[in-house]
């Protein structure tokens, strides 16, 4: 069984994969992870391009588009690893990005999921809108992230470099203990 599997769900994202997958393959495989692309019934050239340009990437072929949650649920039935990262196809990763996540999870067996800080691809000094630095719920039930509240995105000045408990981790870069994911029944297919 692999230690870490990085799984990217794709639907007609040939150009996006061609742009962002090189960093994922390079820096994930360097840290011993296995990279998967779960194709959600694409009708573009995604699968042919992946086979031709990324031979080390493991392909999971789903016959039709099952959406985000069910697409991942079906794909992860075909993955055996201690940890799985659900990673959006438009994420560029950096060297050793998996190391602190795996080290944290190894040391905290009570934790089922975590996430890295996510910075904007276009403006690397700012947080990304999707997930930023961990999710919370305010006292009125409104979800927000460290680094992004409503439409305001903060500059990353190291203010969120500490590890803290979060209420939710973003699906854009969700690092999960696969056994816990399966025990919980996976993602809710209604979303």
Positions of PLM-derived features:
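Short, acidic, metal-binding catalytic loop of nucleotide-sugar glycosyltransferases
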Residues: 22-32
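A recurrent flexible, glycine/aromatic-enriched loop bordering the glycosyltransferase active site
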Residues: 139-144, 150-176, 183, 190-191
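Cell-envelope/extracellular polymer assembly enzymes that use nucleotide-activated donors
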Residues: 3-5, 34
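Glycine-rich, basic loop-to-helix element that forms the pyrophosphate-binding segment
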Residues: 61-79, 89
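A conserved acidic beta->alpha catalytic loop
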Residues: 23, 39-48, 64
């Amino acid at each position: 069984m692999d230690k870490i599997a990085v799984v990217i769900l794709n639907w007609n994202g040939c150009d996006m994969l061609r742009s962002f997958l090189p960093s994922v393959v390079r820096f994930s495989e360097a840290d011993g992870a296995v990279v998967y692309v779960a194709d959600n019934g694409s009708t573009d050239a995604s699968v042919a391009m992946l086979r031709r340009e990324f031979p080390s990437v493991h392909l999971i072929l789903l016959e039709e588009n099952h959406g985000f949650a069910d697409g991942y649920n079906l794909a992860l039935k075909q993955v055996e690893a201690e940890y799985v990262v659900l990673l959006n196809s438009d994420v560029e990763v950096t060297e050793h990005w998996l190391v602190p996540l795996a080290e944290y999870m190894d040391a905290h067996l009570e934790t089922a999921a975590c996430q890295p800080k996510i910075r904007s691809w276009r403006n690397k000094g700012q947080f990304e809108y999707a997930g930023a630095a961990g999710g919370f719920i305010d006292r009125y039930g409104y979800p927000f992230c460290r680094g992004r509240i409503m439409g305001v995105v903060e500059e990353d000045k190291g203010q969120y470099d500490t590890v803290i408990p979060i209420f939710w981790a973003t699906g854009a870069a969700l690092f999960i203990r696969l056994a816990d994911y399966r025990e919980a029944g996976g993602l809710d297919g209604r979303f």
